[in-house]
Amino acid sequence: MDELLTILQEECAEVIQAVSKCRRFGIDNSYSKGAGSQRENLTTEIGDLQCMIDLCIERGIVEKSAVDLAILNKQAKLKIYSDLYKD
């Protein structure tokens, strides 16, 4: 379990870094020659994070039903406190 949590933590940090670069350089730009776009990097990092989340569920570290409920709760908060769900 320790290895799984360590890698989960690392992937969270990599998503944070990818988001920062999207904001800094623009989502469809690359920040170095030969690198893909920030969007491509963000997509990869989110995929890596989702893999680790799925493993946490599969290994019983968290329950899928509890994660699903947390998602619904977050969506409800976003509808109140953000513009993300507004037309």
What are these regions (language model features)?
Residues 1-46, 50-87:
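Flexible "arm" and connector segments at domain edges
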